[in-house]
Amino acid sequence: MSNFSRAVDQKTLLVAGCDTGVGKTVTTSALAAYWWKCGKDQSFGLMKLMQTGLGDDELYQQLFGHLTRWDVVTPLKFATPLAPPLAADQEGKTIDLGVVWQTLQTMQQNHDHVLVEALGSLGSPVTHELTVADIAALWRLETILVVPVQLGAMGQAIAQVALARQTKVKLKGLVLSCASPEAEGKVEDWATPAMLESFTHLPVLGIVPYLTESERENLSRLAEITARFGLEKLAYF
């Protein structure tokens, strides 16, 4: 893995999460939509680290694949909807991180900005030896953490931030994500921003509200959400 440990340039941002299904894809789409709206003279790369089962890559292709000066890439795909090392084992395949690394390098060389969606949580296995946190740290990817607005979210977030610090992930901030209409009215109860900032010493960059399916596929609506984030705290915007 030593060949992968060079510094990655700061135009690349990794979107990680506290768990599977917490809103990483919606958050990534909203950030990408903001770039689409505000960076007309720039080129963009959107990458899913790897995919198991169906889902994110197809949505990204639908939303962004047709845009000029955009590339949407998922370098490794497995049909089995399990953690990547287990999916690869079941399919008789191996996980070649060299392919993922080279894809990232190519995206960085060809685009002004690169946005990468992780899988699962920071503790999720990517190979039999490495987790998402290990990859983020090894590749020096500046990272934001998506926190679900639900009971137990603060404990999840604090534990994930502790893991990030242990593995030396360059964590830049938190994004709160509402997966249900009820969650929007429970932010202060379930994922109190002031308490999260106090315990993690990281800024809460913004809140992704509950979105209907049609809203999740509307670039203008997605861009509106991200425009309210504290993106001045990130170097990419």
UniProtKB/Swiss-Prot annotation:
Task: Specify the domain of life of the species encoding this protein.
Answer: Bacteria
What is the organism of origin for this protein? Synechocystis sp. (strain ATCC 27184 / PCC 6803 / Kazusa)
Q: Which HAMAP family match?
A: BioD
Concerning InterPro entries, the annotation shows: DTB_synth_BioD, P-loop_NTPase
Active-site residues, record numbering mapped to chain: 48
Pathway field of the UniProt record reads: Cofactor biosynthesis; biotin biosynthesis; biotin from 7,8-diaminononanoate: step 1/2
Q: What is the lineage of its organism?
A: Bacteria, Bacillati, Cyanobacteriota, Cyanophyceae, Synechococcales
Binding sites annotated in the UniProt record for ATP: 21-26, 56, 117-120, 177-178, 209-211
Keyword Nuclease carried by entry: no
GO annotation terms (biological process)? biotin biosynthetic process
The record's family statement is: Belongs to the dethiobiotin synthetase family.
Give a Gene Ontology cellular component term annotated to this protein: cytosol
E.C. number: 6.3.3.3
Q: State the protein's name.
A: ATP-dependent dethiobiotin synthetase BioD
Which cofactors are named for this entry? Mg(2+)
